[in-house]
Amino acid sequence: MAVYCSENFSVYPQPSLHPPGAAAAAAAAAAAAAAAAASSGQRAGGYALGDYGAPANAGYLWGMNSPAPYLQGPPGSGAAASPFLPPASYGCSRGGQLVGSPSGPGSPSAGGAELSWLSLASQEELLKLVRPPYSYSALIAMAIQSAPERKLTLSHIYQYVAENFPFYKRSKAGWQNSIRHNLSLNDCFRKVPRDEDDPGKGNYWTLDPNCEKMFDNGNFRRKRKRRSEPNTPATTAAASSLGGLKAEEERPIPASGKPCGNSPPPELDPSPSARDHPKSSSPSGIISSTPSCLSTFFSGMSSLSGGGSRLTGGLSTDLHHRNFSAGQLSGGTFTPSSSSSQEVPSPEQLQRVAGPSPAYYSSFHPSSGSQGAQYNHYYNFTVNSLIYTRDGTEV
């Protein structure tokens, strides 16, 4: 009988393909069983699995050599053994074509060609073709741990691997070289010299006690360094770098993002004690004790406005003799006026040329109040000297 596989890989028998020899043997066995039941006064119960013998032991499938207990005949029945059902996993193919048939005594295709991978006598022959799922380091560790003294020579390690794993019996040159490399490069294996009273050749290899936990069920697992381990160089370096970053964050940052290059001289600083005051530990203390560049500039201008009364006389006389004038402010260009009259530009002209006027210009404008006439010349000089400079003038 041949076995086919359907598209979904299900095995089913084909009753129309029973060999004639098997059908005749089955009919003879059924007739003999019926005659024995009639002679003993019992009624024949029809065909049952117990009426058929076990299939002959065939060497075409490993692990299936023992006959199934439910296919054996009753003891002392004397039924002829004939192949009834082939193994369910034999002869499957995707296309539905016949791959092979059991080579039993009654099979017509006993001498047919079979696949080479199906001709396996035992599980050991199958293991010769399958590589074990262990690394070379794991194989070495298993060999060392199996020794009574927990140490082996290189030749003994080779012997252990070859005896316990049939896959490595075929080609010895490749894996033996890998064993030597792993012994030399892996820190878990240590070389122990021989004793003087121990004859032989080669040193012993032993396993580091700290690495025994790395080999879990034959799988070599490297131990990863924990981040929480104290007093390690990596932890110390990380702590120092974090301390440097924290110190950088505590430094005050100017509001404009640029260093205070235009800060007033020390004599114009209204509060020099603020610079010498120690920094507070809280962020609010850092912000309050360290003024920004803009606040420093405003404080300098306020100090200039407070001390402007002392400079009014000298500046007014000097400006009167030099005959400065505001001139015409149009289109961003300066045209000196030929007249000696001092013209004060309107606020609209100042806003068009220099943008929105800052707060520190309001105290010098003529329309600011009672001090307008006093700072008339000083205001004109300040605006013109900041925006338009005349060649050859010295202030």
Curated annotation (Swiss-Prot):
Placement of sequence motif Nuclear localization signal: 221-227
Where is this protein localized, as stated in its record? Answer: Nucleus
Q: Which UniProt keywords apply?
A: Developmental protein, DNA-binding, Nucleus, Transcription, Transcription regulation
Q: Please list the residue ranges the record marks as binding DNA.
A: 131-225
Q: Which GO terms describe its molecular function?
A: DNA-binding transcription factor activity, RNA polymerase II-specific; RNA polymerase II cis-regulatory region sequence-specific DNA binding
Q: Where is the composition biased (Low complexity)?
A: 234-245, 336-349
Q: What PANTHER family does UniProt report for this protein, alphabetically?
A: FORKHEAD BOX PROTEIN, FORKHEAD BOX PROTEIN I3
Q: What is this protein called?
A: Forkhead box protein I3
Top-level taxonomy: Eukaryota, Metazoa, Chordata, Craniata, Vertebrata
